[in-house]
Amino acid sequence: MYRWFHLFRMDSRSATGSRSVRAKLRRIKTRCAELRESSDAEFRAFGERAADVGEDIAVTVEVARRTIRLEMFDVQIRAALAMADGKIAELQTGEGKTLAAVPAIAWHAKSGNGVHVMTVNDYLAKRDSHWMRPVYNFLGLSVGCIQQGMTAEQRRQAYTCDVTYCTPQEAGFDFLRDQLAMQACEQVQRPFAAAVIDEADSILIDEARIPLVIAGGKTARDALAGRVDEITRGLHNTLHYTIDEHGHNVSLTDEGITFVEKAFGCGNLFDNANLTLHTAVQDSLHAHALLHRDVDYLVRDGAIQPIDEFKGRIARDRRWPAGLQTAVEAKERVSLKTQGRVLGSITLQSLIALFPKLCGMTGTAATQSEEFASVYGLEVEVIPTHRRLIRVDHPDVVFATKREKEQAVVDEIRHVHRAGRPVLVGTASVEDSESFSARLAGIPHETLNARNDEQEAAIVARAGQPGAVTISTNMAGRGVDIRLGEGVPELGGLHVIGTCRHESRRIDNQLRGRAGRQGDPGSSRFFISREDDLLVKHGINHTELQHDVDSLQRAIEGHHLDVRQFLHKYEAVIERQRQSIQQQRQEILTGVRPRPSETARWVALATIDSLWSDHLAAVSALREGIHWVSFGGRDPLHEYLRNVHLMFEELVGRLETEVARRLAESNDGGSNVRQRGATWTYLTTDEPFGTASHRIFAGLTRKVKSRSLWG
């Protein structure tokens, strides 16, 4: 668990038991009935934060009824209590999470320190802030919303509000920009106080490893990439390279090593002098063998656009690490982009850890309760549904081949469509969604994937109409409810078809959860084959396939948890160093550490930024090659932590002397400082592929086993 998480608690021990929760709920409902008798003028006196959270929630419940004409159900009030108590509330699809969060948000906002309400995209941030604004305003609370493309002044105004809706990426980029400000007035955020996380499993788990990066300046394009790409195109699977049984790593065979050495005339590919070439070859091999167009990325407008594997959407402003990004660009023969120098970086996990108060909500949290507890110190409270769930979840249908499975899916779509029921078909990729679309000739349908994600809200809004057929990637899993059209409940409601099982049970459950909202009828069925990627990767081909898949998903989730916890040990030391260096920088920026002149202040800030950027580059290089130390029997983590500590001590020791040197050389009043660069996020390679050097090391280990490098 993070050392710096100081989570707020209401009286969590007593609130844990269902009996206590029911008692609190009764008191709140009784108080709500009393408050209904108050006039608006009398009611506004309750705008101040009450001493008791139950009283405060009752006030907000009544305000919602008066302002936006929405009555809160018991389950929504229970969810609000859980979030006020610093928990993750699991509230099923269609149960009204947006409204349920408002009493908890208002409770924290009344402390006067502001609340970040983080959701998964700009659309939901804008929608929810506008929808709930009358409630907050009646309570005397201001509301802001951060959107991509806003000016610094617009952002500053939004962050000064009592409640600020935003995505974690936008908040993170603003945080990184603030840390590079040359004047205090340039900063847009105030100190973090509390965060309420919508779709908490997506933000706190699925995207937790994604680093937010701010970069500036330019480095030269990779002149080697084109030549390496041409050579890689001549390599053949099994002959020149092998892919591991899970499809996560690729490495050269002896024949492949010889082929590359002859093509480049470089001698021993494993010589230190060839490290840059070897890394470029591994990145190119990875791009060709493991990353697939219309599955992992799109090519649009002459650029590579990665697809978020969990959401099925374009991952905007996101890149792979430099070498792999360049390799994919070379593979698709698009213009190679220049790479910026990294000035600052933070993962979403570390960013959210900076909030002293934290809570959240989602429709799928229980399966990850161990990770919420061990990583964030957050308890998951499962909230019952308002109405009994009557959706029918049929057993999986198992086939020997993908071809048989796909035909069965098409047959089921036709059968349900003839009955007049709407059908939602969930697919794993853009490629799969378009393949099924092509098979449905003669059946009117809509396809939703990363190519047309801007139409998501409109397409999903029509998906519950009689006879509607919607084929979608994971995009249709969150954010927008599928409401049933007239007469659809009598026909049996929405039927959901899953065309494969995913590595995470949560993704499957999100798809199922599109049907049967708030007691509506509905059904779901998953179709799987022994040729599905999930099963092929993990060698599952037994007759009891459904049981095997369930067990496999639990094992994969446990493995991913272990990996994330292990990788946090690598990142935690850098995060502590970042906090230390930024504290010093902020003191200089705000005048806590007085300087003899404005020039000296500017030079000091620019020097800190420059040395920190150098430190990040050195740490990145260290981590990229740290796997080599295990070849000598040493522990990579221990060696990494030791070296990073020594490197940071060197940085701190250089600061004063470097500032003095640069100040002595400054002839322009300190104005010659770096300009802020562009910002982007890039795909983490911690899992599943590993770093380039890790892949090289795996190949080298195999080579040593088969023939001695030194013999």
Describe the residue ranges of each PLM region.
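Conserved P-loop NTPase motor core
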Residues: 1-543, 582
